[in-house]
Amino acid sequence: MLTTTSAQQCPFMSGGEEEGAAATRASAGDGAQEQAARPERGGPTLSFGGATPYVDYAGIDTLLDLQRTRTDEPAESAFLITTQVMELLFVLVRERWEAARDALEADDVPAALAGLRGACRAQDVLNDSWGLLGDMTPTQFNRFRASFGEASGFQSYGYRKLEFLLGNKSAAMIRPHKAMEPVVDELTRLLEAPSLYDAALRLLHRRGLPVPADHVERDWTRAYEPDPGVERAWAEVYADDRPGNDLYLLAEALMDVAERVTRWRHLHLVAVKRTMGGKPGSGGSNGLNWLARHVEQDVFPELWSLRNTI
């Protein structure tokens, strides 16, 4: 049976007394990295001249300096960390949606499917993140709510990028970020480009499916509007559900994305309802009512409405 040391089993675990002794011997000598590494045993390097490469590469010191709560309420830490985790996941989802969109524009369906699958895995983690706030009570939330003033998730430009990629576009939604030029530039780029769904419809058109012309070339800065002609085009795709039909696989992959988006919105609604009920939102919206309307807004609408007639 093959055996490994605990340090070999997991890079985050201590290597034990033997590795500690190796580090002591190395520091007593010239401190050479080769001595601490003990390559003949396969042990980890335990001596570094400054911050460890792990801390340096991942920016751990910077990352862990960002959780600056403004009150003594313990629940604020969970709230702040969850918010920051979600922002990081927004970046990952956006990167994969953009990669999938670009692959569709290049007629590379396998690459698009890979990007969408990767995005769904990130979306699952994103949705699970709401569980970190599942036990926060209204009383706990009220103890730190005033500390963030008018701050609101509505102001997240990371989330706004996702909405633009989904086709939910509005130039007015760039306005809150007008003082941040790089953010404005990035949002404008996404506003003016085809969305993920637009790219899918353009692919269907190139494959000879009856996508209406005004959904193949249009003003990309406008929010997507559903069309019966698009539903008919998807109906032709669903008429052939064999595994070899890459357009059918694409349709279902898009539904996987859409379902997770809907779930995230619903989880957001439930979290707000549980912690603050129907009180006005911190960003000026009517809170619960605004979120409820957002939940009802279908992503990739014809893929949903099609199910009424199949």
Where are the predicted features?
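Surface-exposed peri-terminal alpha-helical interaction modules
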Residues: 2-310
